[in-house]
């Protein structure tokens, strides 16, 4: 979890066994992000950047406008939650990144998303 003066980000990831195929080096993960506005004014998420790293150190960058097709506006005290997915070639990897946001005055700010793990549950003890 990371906090800024205005925004709190929480991420949870889960392995999707039914969509994965280890024999084909295809490991599918879902991640759910909760974005809470802790400030006194609305904020809007405009863009995202992800750095996805597989267990061999191979990096993939993903960036774009909004999340899951929207640029949510989050009122004070409210939260926005969405679920995304990632496919990697190894049973263990990581994701990290940032969100590009604006406040009610149109001033831009960035919220970092710390590294979180993508892992097949049997690998973690």
Swiss-Prot record:
Domain ApaG as annotated: residue spans: 1-125
GO biological process, one term: error-free translesion synthesis
Protein name: Protein ApaG
């Amino acid at each position: 979890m990371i906090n800024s003066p205005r925004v709190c980000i929480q991420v949870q990831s889960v392995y999707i066994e039914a969509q994965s195929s280890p024999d084909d080096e295809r490991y599918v993960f879902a991640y759910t992000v909760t974005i809470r506005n802790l400030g006194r004014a609305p904020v809007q998420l405009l863009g995202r950047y992800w750095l996805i790293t597989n267990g061999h150190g191979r990096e993939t960058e993903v960036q774009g406008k909004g999340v899951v097709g929207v640029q949510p506006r989050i009122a004070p005290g409210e939260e926005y939650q969405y679920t995304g997915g990632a496919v990697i070639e190894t049973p263990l990897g990581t994701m990290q990144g940032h969100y590009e946001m604006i406040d009610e005055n149109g001033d831009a700010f960035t919220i970092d998303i710390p590294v979180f793990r993508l892992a097949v549950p049997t690998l973690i003890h």
